Curated annotation (Swiss-Prot):
The keyword Lipid biosynthesis does not apply. This is Adenine deaminase. It holds the Pfam family Adenine_deam_C. Its cofactor is Mn(2+). InterPro entries: Adenine_deam, Adenine_deam_C, Amidohydro-rel, Metal-dep_hydrolase_composite, Metal_Hydrolase.
Length: 565
């Protein structure tokens, strides 16, 4: 919907009617902090006129409303919404999110470049502007079996794609510090481009070395002190509020007008239930203001600062020449969008219906032989046993130890001590490997839950008390082409098929949301106390997040960066 320069100039000068005029609203100026009554004239996908009165071929009365720049989610994995990019677009764009910067490393870990190309192709057909960061860590480390491996030479052909910003979160920070050849090759290939970071708890001179590798932004700060150190060292900090990783409350104290130019907002991993019940970036804005952050600082972080951090110079302000990404709100505090424009297009049912689709990829990706209950035994001779300790609302875990006496060579789950079996089974048809261990924090008293969403290798993960139920849930996911399942007493209590790479549903967003409600209720019937049991489970297998994790190759001591014997 672009227009010629001549048309933009004439419409901006008011010589001819604008394509669209938003009348009588108040614009929140993110430079001065003023609320200014003005019309906003739009030519094609560009804002061409503000601070004046305009006539348009189409006019929308925004009397009593506040106009703000569209919001930018600076780091997310669309796959965590459990729907395709098209349903994600329909789900969040009407909330004011007009730009999202995604790292498709979930689907890339399943099917490699095919998954990244799927996102790039889909991004050209959406109402929102979906930008792609090329996945840097596929797999995330050498201690897991993923469905693909991407090296610098694989990513290089996509470097100049118009929808690619740069290199996505560099999770293997130990590899950077140890100058691993594969890591160094990627850093060199993207030198001078935007490189996103991922360095939880990294401080001091090690953080200096990591930043010196050319890494500009980072979203893993969980305390104000950690975030301030990263700000002082020149990083842009992305404040995160996902479905599991909830850092906004801990970081809201730094969200001030002084710091806002160097802060952004992101969701990282947010599921449809949270989006439906609470919101997305709009939820973060409401929450931050409610917690006392100045509205000017919050809205800057949500748009202008985000645009500047990622080199998107054509957006972030309601000003002539900028992309017509606008959210029309009831109030700054409420942040409920009555109307959203994305590139000058009204984000409504007609716009979503007009999109052309893209054929999904990575079907039939669960390549696992039938699993027997005996596969979930945990052999051992010593009573002293490492246990993954869950911290609710965090993806960081504790490295605990428990005394578990083996019975007939098997260390068995003990619900009385909240010690459940956890297993990860390779599902990409490569090694057939599996590992078993213990996790504490689910509160599970019976049954099992299973998932093929298992960061970042996305193998088949199962947590349970009863081996037969664990096998039942795992085998059900083989039949569904991946997804979630809850089993107890020899029956499947709830399920959700995720046939696109074992990660995304082909069903509408609303149906996925309803299925998640049923799954959550079924998990609670097993005694599970976690608010987000499936997302919490997914992160227990990510060996770049301290302190103890599990992959298909064994229990991983993340601090020592090694598999436990």
């Amino acid at each position: 919907m672009s227009r010629s320069l001549s048309e933009c100039i004439d419409q901006g000068r008011g010589l001819v009617p604008a394509d669209l005029v938003l009348k009588h609203g108040r614009v929140f100026d993110l430079v001065t902090g003023e609320l200014v009554q003005t019309d906003v004239a739009i030519c094609g996908d560009r804002i061409v006129g503000t601070f004046g009165t305009y006539t348009g071929r189409r006019e929308i009365d925004c009397r009593g409303r506040i106009l703000v720049p569209g919001f930018i989610d600076t780091h997310l994995h669309v796959e965590s919404s459990l729907v395709t990019p098209f349903e994600f677009d329909r789900c969040v764009t009407p909330r004011g999110i007009t730009t999202a910067i995604c790292d498709p490393h979930e689907i890339a870990n399943v099917c490699g470049l095919e998954g990244i190309r799927y996102f790039l192709e889909a991004s050209a057909h959406l109402v929102m502007d979906l930008r792609v960061q090329l996945s840097s860590c596929v797999p995330s480390t050498h201690m897991e079996t993923a469905g693909a491996a991407l090296e610098a030479k694989d990513l290089a052909p996509l470097l100049d794609h118009p929808r690619v910003i740069g290199l996505a979160e560099f999770m293997n920070f130990p590899g950077v510090l140890m100058k691993d050849p594969g890591c160094m090759a990627k850093l060199e290939a993207f030198r001078g481009r935007h490189i996103d970071g991922h360095a939880p708890l990294l401080r001091g001179k090690d953080l200096n070395g990591y930043i010196a590798a050319g890494i500009r932004t980072e979203h893993e700060a969980t305390t104000a002190d950690e975030a301030l150190e990263k700000l002082r060292k020149g990083m842009r900090v992305l404040i995160r509020e996902g479905s599991v990783s909830k850092d906004l409350h801990a970081l809201v104290s730094i969200l001030t007008e002084r710091h806002a130019p160097y802060l952004c907002l992101c969701t990282d991993d947010r599921n449809p239930l949270d989006i439906a019940e609470h919101g997305h970036i709009d939820h973060m804005i409401r929450t931050a203001i409610r917690l006392g952050a100045p509205p000017l600082a919050v809205y800057r972080a949500a748009s202008l600062s985000a645009a500047e951090a990622f080199g998107l110079k054509d957006r972030g302000l309601i000003a002539p020449g900028r992309r017509a990404d606008i959210a029309v709100l009831d109030s700054l505090e409420g942040c409920h969008a009555a109307l959203v424009l994305a590139g000058g297009v009204v984000a409504d049912d007609a716009a979503f219906s007009a999109r052309s689709g893209v054929e999904p990829v990575a079907r039939a990706s669960v390549k696992v032989a039938e699993i027997a209950p005996e596969a979930f035994r945990c052999p051992g001779n010593r009573a002293e046993t490492p246990v993954i300790g869950i911290l609710p609302g965090k993806i960081i875990t504790e490295h605990l130890t428990a005394e578990i006496e083996p019975v007939d060579g098997d260390k068995r789950p003990d619900p009385a001590r909240d010690l459940a079996r956890i297993a990860v089974i390779e599902r990409h048809g490569k090694t057939g490997g599996r590992a078993t261990g213990f996790v504490q924090g689910f509160g599970m008293a019976r049954g099992a839950i299973a998932s093929t969403v298992c960061h970042d290798h996305h193998n088949l993960a199962v947590v349970g008390i009863d081996y037969a139920d664990m096998a039942l849930a795992a085998n059900r996911l083989r039949a569904l082409e991946g997804g979630f399942a809850v089993a107890a007493g020899g029956e499947i209590l709830a399920e959700l098929a995720l046939p696109v790479g074992g990660l995304m549903s082909l069903r509408p967003f609303e149906e996925v949301r309803d299925a998640l409600v049923t799954l959550r209720e079924a998990a609670r019937s097993l005694g599970v106390t976690l608010e987000e049991p499936f997302l919490q489970l997914a992160f227990l297998a990510l060996p770049v997040i301290p302190h103890l994790k599990i992959t298909d190759r064994g229990m991983v001591d993340v601090d020592r960066f090694e598999i436990l014997p």
